[in-house]
């Protein structure tokens, strides 16, 4: 075989050790020390299955069964299953409760995986309206309008889907309003919580939802791929239907889902998650401070104000103007950040960028503010 295997030896990553990472897709997935320790015990393939009697969610050692029960309590739901991610959770719901050709009514800020999931399940969709620039907030009443339009045209609706917090602008949707609309119309509501569960408090019962799709690696301090599907008991028979061939295995889970390091890291991080969501107001204070300071530089924060989530998206005409004159062009900002030990911002981007300071200390946040201020002021003239 003509294969150079040297590139697979000694693979390393120093981003988290050497650089303050501002990437919003990664800030919520950083493991605490206690979760890192468990990796050494469960890094072998099927190590989680030492005492398995046939189904992942029933394993007692390690206590996966108890963890899933506790997670249901944490989320204000009835039943929870591990998945490989929020996208798999969404697909499981769609594939179980919808019929081929049904319509999913979903918000205009939905993640691409929501579309991929419904397409894979052979479903159609109608997208609801969002506010115009610069807020881009989901408009709850648009759900009622789209539902009415579909019903009037004789289309079958299988599911209502709402993105709790979108990854583009970090807007927090008004779940209660959409939940009331879904209930009044008689349709189940799936809440995509990939950017919320694990970062901020989420209670499914209070929010009036039927399903929660969560991401372990995106927002719950877990290794990937890992997610959760939490459901209300009334949908247990549909979602958790078992195989005719192997009556123990649940169809939508394809028998067993996330096992090994992903599920164990999620379990080990659970105490950390419970505590950190209690400090959500402190996270918002840091986020709003960043927005306040950077808008003084000429940055334009997109999305709702005041910010209600740690994801921040800035339009940065001042950086784009600097890039026009700098010989490094669009790469100048990335390189200047790197010099100062800051990463997570896409290379070559100066028109706009996204960032998050979730989980960083106050001193780290101040350092980031001071660094970006200095980059702008030193290069603006």
Swiss-Prot record:
Statement: the UniProt record of this protein carries the keyword Transferase: yes
Binding site for pyridoxal 5'-phosphate: 86-87, 192, 215-217
Broadest EC class assigned to this enzyme: transferase
Modified residues (N6-(pyridoxal phosphate)lysine): 218
Enzyme Commission number(s) from the entry: 2.5.1.73
Reactions catalysed: O-phospho-L-seryl-tRNA(Cys) + hydrogen sulfide + H(+) = L-cysteinyl-tRNA(Cys) + phosphate
Highest taxon of source: Archaea
Keywords tagged on the record: Protein biosynthesis, Pyridoxal phosphate, Transferase
Transferase keyword on record: yes
Transmembrane segments: none
One of the GO biological process terms: translation
Cofactor(s) this protein cannot do without: pyridoxal 5'-phosphate
Gene3D superfamilies with a match to the protein in the record: Aspartate Aminotransferase, domain 1 (3.90.1150.10), Type I PLP-dependent aspartate aminotransferase-like (Major domain) (3.40.640.10)
Annotated GO MF terms: Sep-tRNA:Cys-tRNA synthase activity
Family membership noted in the UniProt record: Belongs to the SepCysS family.
Function, in words: Converts O-phospho-L-seryl-tRNA(Cys) (Sep-tRNA(Cys)) to L-cysteinyl-tRNA(Cys) (Cys-tRNA(Cys)).
Complexes and interactors: Homodimer. Interacts with SepRS.
Protein name: O-phospho-L-seryl-tRNA:Cys-tRNA synthase
Natural source organism: Methanococcus vannielii (strain ATCC 35089 / DSM 1224 / JCM 13029 / OCM 148 / SB)
Taxonomic path: Archaea, Methanobacteriati, Methanobacteriota, Methanomada group, Methanococci
